Amino acid sequence: MCDEDVAALVVDNGSGMCKAGFAGDDAPRAVFPSIVGRPRHQGVMVGMGQKDSYVGDEAQSKRGILTLKYPIEHGIVTNWDDMEKIWHHTFYNELRVAPEEHPVLLTEAPLNPKANREKMTQIMFETFNTPAMYVAIQAVLSLYASGRTTGIVLDSGDGVSHTVPIYEGYALPHAILRLDLAGRDLTDYLMKILTERGYSFTTTAEREIVRDIKEKLCYVALDFEHEMTTAASSSSLEKSYELPDGQVITIGNERFRCPEAMFQPSFLGMEACGIHETTFNSIMKCDVDIRKDLYANTVLSGGSTMFPGIADRMQKEIGALAPSTMKIKIIAPPERKYSVWIGGSILASLSTFQQMWISKQEYDESGPSIVHRKCF
């Protein structure tokens, strides 16, 4: 096969979900939890030929007998052995491809430590023998997916949120801000406030149920205090949810109290600024001449920006912080849950990008540090 016919693989490794597929496609083929599970008790199931580890959906479905671990914490890989298992699962079980036959585009968190990028590069070339690879910053890919090269991206996933100002395709590292508050924290917070209502959710398996409640029923209030008053005086905001055992629970103000923590981290006992203030602070760290372009191109990305009402609230809050004459535009594409992956798919299929890949030959000559020279 000649190089032109080989589709590149695009793998977006998130703290919560791994998204993988082929460059040129408009959506990822595989989306599965970034988890590795190991049996809690040895040999419970006699004759099952029990594996020593399970990845993704299989780990999720067998969660009752496993201990689940997330190898990516706050967007950054912390457990490389488990990460390798996730990549192996991605190539061989999900996409069913031979990684030695395809260039691979990986994504990384903004401000990812140098040693981490090198380790990713090394594993791709030495363990999986890929012919070529590239590492791209997640938020930059989201911006590309929205058809822009300048703007500020608020990327909020399961493990971490970042505000990343980008000018003419380049992230501005001095102005990137990280907020360790994301989907997993919101799920934990919802578990806590549902417990106050008398429903008990404690185990990792029950956390998944609460995550589903969060995704299906939560929303962001435009005016939090006003919404609290409405919730107290009527049942119009109440919704019911059926648990796997058939029990039905009712949730009211929890629906918007949970995501409100993104705007008021003090709800979680955190001293950090909310996502609106973090976005504003990021813009203020940029050169005064480009701020106008950032305000007018504020792009939301990641699963934790999927709450209904979030764009209107961001518009209102940033409007209150910015100069009164400033034009502010919040862009919330419907496919933003996967916009990092989509941006990667676009980038890896551009003809102009083909000379950007790090080839196996370049890696063999320079070693893992080549990644800092070719990917920025």
UniProtKB/Swiss-Prot annotation:
Propeptide: 1-2
Keyword Hydrolase carried by entry: yes
Post-translational modification comment from the UniProt entry: Oxidation of Met-45 and Met-48 to form methionine sulfoxide promotes actin filament depolymerization. Methionine sulfoxide is produced stereospecifically, but it is not known whether the (S)-S-oxide or the (R)-S-oxide is produced.
Keyword Repressor: no
Top-level division of the source organism's lineage: Eukaryota
Catalytic activity: ATP + H2O = ADP + phosphate + H(+)
Protein known as: Actin, acrosomal process isoform
Organism: Limulus polyphemus (Atlantic horseshoe crab)
